[in-house]
Every structure is written in structure tokens, then in C-alpha cells.
């Protein structure tokens, strides 16, 4: 499957630049773009990535891995790849900070599927750093509160049947959009939370 480049409307007028691939041999280049061109150029307090996983139909395996920095999203379809990408494993185990929502399940899936763990302190659980009235605030609740009200309809606008198609190559357009937005929301939520916390620390 050839690598595909495109744009996804996140919300309002916010556009995401999206790379979608299942080619393991091309991943080192795209990961280098994330780490060196964008990540290393940012201020220290902005050095983190949004991370999200989509699961196989039986919920046991990782089907898709999404990484986001600012408006740049990389979608790697692990399920339809050759499942050999040591550069990605090294990237996940490096000292980069990742922000995600479903941290418990994602950690278990990475341990079971990849045999790796993101280092302690490098995986931020957004559900522990930001809570509404819910015991475990969902990504949708957080996105509505901090990013845009449009995210309140995300689950209802994405048919349940599509959740069983993350292993399909080529992914449907609606799945690509959903995956890109999930990764972006993970990034943008943590960015906004950090901005608020930074401002509060400097209020006198």
C-alpha cells in the first residue's frame, strides 16, 4: 500500500497534515521528521507528542498507532504492515514524553504486542491530570471542555461498525479522519492543560 498524504479538518478551521502508511521501511524517515524537524525545534515545555492506539476487531491487538505533534499526524497501520519496525519501538522507548487518554489498556497492548513499555514518567495519563465531575473523564468530555464543542458528537458520528475495520488495508476515509483527530486531541489537550498550569504558577 503506498503511503498517503492528506489533510483532515480537526474542528472549525483547524487543519491537520496527515501521513498514513503501513510501510515499515518508510517509518524511520517520518519518525525523524517528528523528532528532529518539529520536536527538537520547539521550546522545552512543548516537547511532547500525542499518542493513540486503535485496536483489532477482537480487542486483543494493536491495529493502528497514531502520533501527533502540533498539526502533524503520523498514522501507522501496524495490522497491515510486516510487523517489523524496530525504529518505531526505539522511538516509543526513547525519552520523549507522550500524552494519551486510555493509558492502562494502551500499556497492556504495547507490552503484549510489541514487548515494550514506554519509560515511567514519559507516558502522561490525561485522565489523571484533568478531571471534570466524572470519575474517569473521557476524551470527548475533555475535548469539549478544552478544545471545541464539536468533539461532543464524535462518537455518534463514527459508526460502531467502523471500529471493526482498523485492520483493513486501505483504511476508509472516515477511519483515517477519526484516527487523526484522536491523536491530535491527545496532543492538544495536554498542550492546553500545560498552558493553563503554567499561567496559574505565574499568577501572583
Named regions from a protein language model:
Residues 72-92, 96:
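Nucleic-acid-processing active sites and adjacent nucleic-acid-binding tracks
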Residues 144-204:
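Acidic, Mg2+-coordinating catalytic module of metal-dependent nucleases/exonucleases
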Residues 1-49, 81, 126, 195-204:
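N-terminal accessory regions of nucleic-acid-interacting proteins
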Residues 48-60:
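Short acidic, Gly/Ser-rich segments with clustered Asp/Glu that frequently serve as metal-coordination loops
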Residues 124-148:
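Short alpha-helix plus adjacent loop in nuclease-associated cores
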